[in-house]
């Protein structure tokens, strides 16, 4: 009888574990080469509250806590579709031209999101901008509904990164 109870308990734990299994950590890494010096490119993206100047999906950004480019600052992005995303600056390194931030809340289908954007030299008067992020899908069920799965979260973030990087290149390289 004791074995039967242990078996039932183990079976229940296995089933409940699969229903509430932790979503895997997902990664996105996108980059673009821009025909401009790293200082010029960094000048365009360096302000934590300046995303709307180069990302086409962001209509407005504003600091809602702390000070621009200071660790701990929070910004609210208002997207062109009306949605909002609140982000917190985790690290800022002007010397190495990079910053790291986390999404605190918002309309994107991700959770536990942390990203870094950086600019490095890529030859004479050329720069490589790299945007990397780690995150989980927002929906926590082991079998999420369609459009709430890992593929949707990854595809969304690739789209966000590509739109921003491609527009940044276009703006900087425009005659």
Specify the residue positions occupied by each region the protein language model found:
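Hydrophobic ligand-binding cavity/cleft-lining segments
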Residues: 19-67
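Glycine-rich portal/gate segments that line the openings of hydrophobic small-molecule binding cavities
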Residues: 33, 62-109, 126, 163-175
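Stable alpha-helical elements in mature extracytoplasmic
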Residues: 37-38, 44-50, 85, 153, ...
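Bacterial N-terminal signal peptides that target proteins for export
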Residues: 1-8
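Amphipathic hydrophobic-ligand
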Residues: 24, 109-116
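Cleavable N-terminal signal peptides
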Residues: 8-9, 19
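A conserved amphipathic terminal alpha-helix motif
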Residues: 128, 135-175
């Amino acid at each position: 009888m004791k074995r039967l109870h242990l078996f039932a308990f183990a079976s229940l734990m296995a089933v409940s574990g699969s229903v509430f299994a932790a979503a895997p950590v997902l990664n996105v890494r996108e980059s673009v080469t821009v025909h401009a010096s790293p200082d010029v490119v960094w000048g365009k993206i360096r302000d934590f509250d300046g995303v709307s100047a180069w990302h086409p999906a962001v209509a407005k950004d504003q600091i809602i806590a702390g000070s621009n480019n200071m660790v701990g600052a929070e910004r609210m992005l208002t997207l062109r579709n009306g949605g909002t995303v609140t982000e917190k600056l985790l690290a800022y390194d002007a010397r190495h031209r990079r910053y790291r931030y986390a999404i605190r809340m918002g309309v994107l289908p991700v959770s536990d999101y942390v990203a870094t954007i950086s600019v490095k030299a890529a030859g004479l008067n050329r720069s490589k901008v790299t945007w990397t992020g780690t995150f989980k899908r927002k929906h926590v069920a082991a079998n999420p509904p369609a459009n709430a799965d890992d593929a949707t979260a990854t595809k969304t973030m690739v789209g966000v990164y590509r739109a921003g990087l491609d527009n940044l290149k276009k703006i900087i390289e425009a005659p």
